[in-house]
Amino acid sequence: MALTKTINIDGKEVTFRASAAIPRLYRVKFHRDIYKDLDALQKAMGGSDENASTLDTFSLELFENISYVMAKHADPSIPDTPEGWLEEFNTFSIYQVLPQIIELWGLNVQTDVTTKKKLRATERPMTTALFLLRCIQIGLSIRDLDLLTIGMVNDLYAESRNDECQDSYRQLASQEDFDAF
């Protein structure tokens, strides 16, 4: 289930879409890791105070690229390049748009895994490569990624690694079961 959010930018309503496919789409388009880029942007932005931020030209380009991928994912009819898309606006304020995109991304990444599951905690930060590896390990297709949030993928991965959950799903089918099917 992908999440969407409509943001008014320069008097134009723009829809952004966050789904589990975004890390892959971003990596394919820009050859970068969206998790690392969002983390760098959040640190550089320094809250909502424009004077406290350390945004440079590279940070602005990251922001534009992330915004573009999420907008293109919501509306395939927008131009095929970030530059073409940005030409549609007179102003595109990072301080107006980025907090809302980060909020949308945060909702997409939320997970429902409960603490009662006996999983080993990991100190490994989530990266696009790790996320895609987990998708492969649980057998998800690109079509599946478009329908799931990242939190849902993490839940599926956690349950696939949880022995208690795996035991409850293990059932052997008899010939009678196949005949009845």
Regions found by a protein language model. Name each.
Residues 1-13, 20, 32-61, 73-181:
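Charged interaction scaffolds used for protein-protein
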Residues 24-30:
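Covalent nucleotidyltransferase core used to form phosphodiester bonds in nucleic acids
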